[in-house]
């Protein structure tokens, strides 16, 4: 023990003194034996490795061009890629992690304040709550339908534009229908769309006179087809299922109004 802790006038070497923390010990530090089982924490070791290997990227924005250069002092050039994107230091602030109790270092209230609704237990205040007054989302006027946020719903037609019909290469006088478009490979409906009818839209121009049959036409498409001399045929829709009792009532109503029209016509002739 005396040999280990013997005082010496020789100053400690700077090379070995860097490996030990500063202390008030005045002896010869070279006599200490290094403990081979004294390892640094794994988390600290990994953090040092990441600091050595990582290079911070600085995006230099200019009016003419944008350059990406590594930070000052880094020897290796690192490319600016999607896998090394990240926010600038200090641009994103971490939320305050509120503890529980005095040991958290935030006092007895733990960062929630003294009293009030926000300091109590539970989920807190619901989103949009304004203290009891009429909230903003209920004060604004209501919009119905798609403008108010409702879904547009499932598609009701298989749409096709005039430019697609022009590219298909139909000859003059040929018939354009859902079957002919399928045969030419212009449309290939699958799943639920196989039972949907055809609708013609007006994007593009058509220079050939054709016989077009579809369930529906947009306004611009109908105008362009009539201007080009095409024949437009609106196909009837699928018959809606009606109960037998409702069908009898409708037939009775049609019969009643037919008699009424005939009576009014006879009165007009006699007058």
From Swiss-Prot:
Report the domain of life of the source organism.
Answer: Eukaryota
How is this protein organized at the quaternary level?
A: Component of the chloroplast large ribosomal subunit (LSU). Mature 70S chloroplast ribosomes of higher plants consist of a small (30S) and a large (50S) subunit. The 30S small subunit contains 1 molecule of ribosomal RNA (16S rRNA) and 24 different proteins. The 50S large subunit contains 3 rRNA molecules (23S, 5S and 4.5S rRNA) and 33 different proteins.
GO terms, molecular function: mRNA binding; structural constituent of ribosome
Which residue stretches does the UniProt record annotate as biased composition, category Basic residues?
91-101
Protein name, UniProt field: Large ribosomal subunit protein uL15c
Q: Where is the composition biased (Gly residues)?
A: 102-114
Q: Where found, per UniProt?
A: Plastid, Chloroplast
Q: Which NCBIfam families match?
A: rplO_bact (TIGR01071)
Which residues does the annotated region (Disordered) include? 1-21, 66-120
Instruction: List the GO biological process terms.
Output: translation
The family classification in the record reads: Belongs to the universal ribosomal protein uL15 family.
């Amino acid at each position: 023990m005396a040999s280990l802790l013997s005082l010496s006038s020789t100053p400690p070497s700077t090379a070995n003194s860097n490996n030990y923390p500063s202390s008030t010990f005045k002896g010869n530090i070279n006599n200490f034996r290094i403990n081979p089982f004294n390892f640094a924490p794994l988390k600290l070791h990994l953090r040092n490795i990441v600091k050595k290997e990582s290079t911070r990227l600085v995006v230099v924005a200019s009016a003419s061009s944008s350059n990406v250069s590594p930070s000052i002092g880094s020897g290796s050039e690192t490319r600016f890629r999607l896998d090394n994107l990240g926010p600038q230091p200090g641009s994103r602030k971490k939320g305050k992690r509120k503890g529980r109790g005095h040991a958290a270092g935030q006092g007895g209230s733990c960062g929630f304040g003294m009293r009030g609704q926000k300091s109590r237990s539970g989920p807190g205040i619901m989103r949009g709550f304004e203290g009891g007054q009429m909230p903003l989302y209920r004060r604004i006027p209501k919009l119905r339908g798609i403008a108010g946020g409702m879904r547009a719903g499932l598609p009701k037609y298989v749409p096709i534009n005039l430019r697609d019909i022009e590219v298909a290469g139909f000859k003059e006088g040929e018939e354009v229908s859902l079957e002919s478009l399928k045969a030419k490979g212009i449309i290939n409906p699958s799943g639920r769309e196989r039972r949907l009818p055809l609708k013609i839209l007006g994007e593009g121009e058509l220079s050939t006179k054709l016989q077009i049959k579809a369930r529906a036409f947009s306004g611009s498409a109908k105008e362009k087809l009539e201007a080009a001399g095409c024949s437009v045929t609106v196909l009837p829709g699928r018959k809606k299922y009606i109960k037998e009792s409702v069908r009898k009532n409708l037939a009775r109503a049609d019969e009643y109004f037919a008699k009424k029209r005939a009576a009014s016509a006879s009165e007009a002739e006699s007058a």
